[in-house]
From Swiss-Prot:
GO terms for biological process: asexual sporulation; sporulation resulting in formation of a cellular spore. GO terms for cellular component: endospore-forming forespore. The gene is sspH2. It holds the Pfam family SspH. InterPro entries: SASP_SspH. It comes from Clostridium botulinum (strain Hall / ATCC 3502 / NCTC 13319 / Type A). Belongs to the SspH family. Keywords: Sporulation. It is found in: Spore core. This is Small, acid-soluble spore protein H 2.
Amino acid sequence: MKSERAKQIIDSKKYIPVYYKNTPVHIEKVDNKENIAHIKSLNTDKEIVVNVKTLSECNKLNN
């Protein structure tokens, strides 16, 4: 995913499913300069920082 798309998802009024390594997540914020996203797992509530490219709108494992 590109950082611009991640920002669009954050700003969207509707729910858009996002996945990190096949785990559903919520994008908390995006840093466009560093190309990173602060995310929260919907399964565990664990918060982590990841490269935006590792996020997906479809439920597929990203390498």
